[in-house]
Amino acid sequence: MRPAAAKVPKWLLLALSALLPQWPAASAWELTILHTNDVHSRLEQTSDDSTKCLNASLCVGGVARLFTKVQQIRKEEPNVLFLDAGDQYQGTIWFTVYKGLEVAHFMNILGYDAMALGNHEFDNGVEGLIDPLLRNVKFPILSANIKARGPLAHQISGLFLPSKVLSVGGEVVGIVGYTSKETPFLSNPGTNLVFEDEISALQPEVDKLKTLNVNKIIALGHSGFEMDKLIAQKVRGVDIVVGGHSNTFLYTGNPPSKEVPAGKYPFIVTADDGRQVPVVQAYAFGKYLGYLKVEFDDKGNVITSYGNPILLNSSIPEDATIKADINQWRIKLDNYSTQELGRTIVYLDGSTQTCRFRECNMGNLICDAMINNNLRHPDEMFWNHVSMCIVNGGGIRSPIDEKNNGTITWENLAAVLPFGGTFDLVQLKGSTLKKAFEHSVHRYGQSTGEFLQVGGIHVVYDINRKPWNRVVQLEVLCTKCRVPIYEPLEMDKVYKVTLPSYLANGGDGFQMIKDELLKHDSGDQDISVVSEYISKMKVVYPAVEGRIKFSAASHYQGSFPLVILSFWAMILILYQ
């Protein structure tokens, strides 16, 4: 008779198993995801702040450098997907001239596997998306929450998809796309595209992939970091979220450049069903290449995820063939920069002496262009969704003379707006706007850059008052009205304002805007906005209209010292 086997206590088995090394399952599969978002026409390398490259040794990004890094990773690693989360369009002269053809050409060369539609892909209307991009790319473009109707439904059918199943290293991976449902307020998609709620549209598409036995699913889209996190939490079956739109920088450890991380990379969201879902973005402007490693078990569950954005600095060489191609395409840009956009029949005063002290007609022209660029008709209750513009006087760097036929070229505008920023859309409470206008004149008379030029706003200052109490009157143009009129600013009301990205990020001391903004959507390149407005108008003649006034007691405050000096100089001359 065999002796009975001694029973080992459960607690001892658990303790021993905890001490044993945890080897990954034999069927575990690893995927490398390379990703970009919000590149905004930065085909050439740029300076560290994404403006024009002035010192090549300090410059970053560009498609020639991106190509080098992507090719290196593809050679070294077996299972690689290269994805873009939208907004390749808009941002530099490249898009102004080529209107998306350059995007299709260089994205094809880079070998992207899929792209989600961003809001800026609609900036030139649906035709400006179909012909340059959708008909020319060699990879799928995705969005599950955009639905076409009417005649457009047939025209655009099959040119973009809700999802795509890709084969990678013997496995299948599903990609579902999404686009900000606010695109009709941010761009020009027309009336025959409906932008549905992202989560409601994604869930049935993910469910469909699940019925096809696709158990590894990436949500790729362009709705901002907050929506990315909600999708990770709410959409059952999504394993990874690759996002864009909010230009979010995530990083684990010490960041390699000046961007401050909004969280660790990847950012882990606990889904409602308990799964841990990695969420990533890669900042913007092609400065970084997102690099995410994900390990799946045989059921498609994420076991681990790790990585970091790769800074594309000068330590990574630019591919010579791509660089030569860029230079060839650039010839047309150089010719364009000297072509006439339109004419002015008045002097466009962009001088420091004017724009940092009082209303200047160059500031009025810029603000009029910014509001015109945001003309939408989203609701019969509103004539437009935004009526207000602010621009820091220090950002206006040059006048344009009406003499010599008053010709305005891209080069002229580059002298006026040399910093290569964007004109963005934010939502602010009235109380924040009031603080901004107090900041505008808190050290008035010192030729500082924070003095605001405006559109859709009437402001009256009394410079004799103490700083931070100098705004006497502040009125804003209504939007929910059939006949626009100026109404007193309400402190608790939320307003939409178009402004330079520099101000949205707290530049010139406008920290209250950065800290208190309720929403921030990136916009179009500053020069492009003004150039397109001038081209549309053909002839411009902006006036000084009384948008900015000073109370009678302080009207001559800025020039008072000069008046006194002139008086005493005259006395000396008379008595010599």
Curated annotation (Swiss-Prot):
AMP binds at R356, N392, R397, F419, Y502, D508. Homodimer. Keywords: Cell membrane, Disulfide bond, Glycoprotein, GPI-anchor, Hydrolase, Lipoprotein, Membrane, Metal-binding, Nucleotide-binding, Signal, Zinc. Belongs to the 5'-nucleotidase family. The lineage of its organism: Eukaryota, Metazoa, Chordata, Craniata, Vertebrata. The keyword Secreted does not apply. It is an enzyme of class 3 (hydrolase). This is 5'-nucleotidase. The gene is Nt5e.
